[in-house]
Amino acid sequence: MGQKVHPHGIRLGIVKPWSSTWFANTQDFADNLEGDFKVRQFLNKELANASVSRITIERPAKSIRVTIHTARPGIVIGKKGEDVEKLRNAVAKIAGVPAQINIAEVKKPELDAKLVADSIASQLERRVMFRRAMKKAVQNAMRLGAKGIKVEVSGRLGGAEIARSEWYREGRVPLHTLRADIDYNTAEAHTTYGVIGVKVWIFKGEILGGMAALAQPEQQPTDKPKKVPRGKGRK
């Protein structure tokens, strides 16, 4: 039976960047890795209601720089930056080095696989019909410019005695095309009948040029003024 490789893992270094970017000596590598894991675990727990998409970590010169990608930056920052200052102190204590926290806003949460999966899971926990939740997520993603999306839910759907899986797809989701920009993530819905798993694949288009193309900032197209033809009248 064929199995699916993780869409991010197979594309690392091709069209997907690493979530942690640092170099370390052999004796420091394990400590840094454990620190990254604990920092992410802490932030995901503290910011459970802040619509956090992903957390990227860099370690420049005996310090740690954490970038939180969220659809609701106001909740993370707090009143006059009080909440983000508390997070910075907590992260510095966990990592054991000075910490810097940056907040990056997710402009289109409907095109982010993590946020879509979390949204479907929260709807399932509120007893929304799973087909309605799946279809709504697919329609919103396609409306905002996704080239394709696939959503799968697994478990005791609708309180059924026997667990099963159902999926819904629109557009194309080329999992074998390595230059395809595919966002993938999962979530869990804890219902009275048990846990329902949610998986989301979103195809945003193909990236030509690999990681070099990702590093370059996007250039906004400049609208050139249209030339108005002059009539041939008497001078």
UniProtKB/Swiss-Prot annotation:
GO CC, one annotated term: cytosolic small ribosomal subunit
Q: Which GO terms describe its biological process?
A: translation
Q: Which Pfam families match?
A: KH_2 (PF07650), Ribosomal_S3_C (PF00189)
Residue ranges constituting the KH type-2 domain according to the UniProt record: 39-107
User: What SMART domains does the record point to?
Assistant: KH
What highest taxon heads this organism's lineage? Bacteria
Question: Transmembrane stretches, by residue range?
Answer: none
In terms of CDD domains, this protein maps to: KH-II_30S_S3 (cd02412)
Which of UniProt's keywords are assigned here? Ribonucleoprotein, Ribosomal protein, RNA-binding, rRNA-binding
> Where do the record's region annotations for Disordered lie?
216-235
GO MF term set: mRNA binding; rRNA binding; structural constituent of ribosome
UniProt-listed InterPro entries: KH_dom (IPR004087), KH_dom-like_a/b (IPR015946), KH_dom_type_2 (IPR004044), KH_sf_prok-type (IPR009019), Ribosomal_S3_C_sf (IPR036419), Ribosomal_uS3_bac-typ (IPR005704), Ribosomal_uS3_C (IPR001351), Ribosomal_uS3_CS (IPR018280)
The record describes its quaternary structure and partners as: Part of the 30S ribosomal subunit. Forms a tight complex with proteins S10 and S14.
Q: Which family does it belong to?
A: Belongs to the universal ribosomal protein uS3 family.
Q: Which HAMAP family match?
A: Ribosomal_uS3_B (MF_01309_B)
Please give the function described in this protein's UniProt entry. Answer: Binds the lower part of the 30S subunit head. Binds mRNA in the 70S ribosome, positioning it for translation.
Name the record gives this protein: Small ribosomal subunit protein uS3
The organism is: Aggregatibacter actinomycetemcomitans
Gene name per UniProt? rpsC
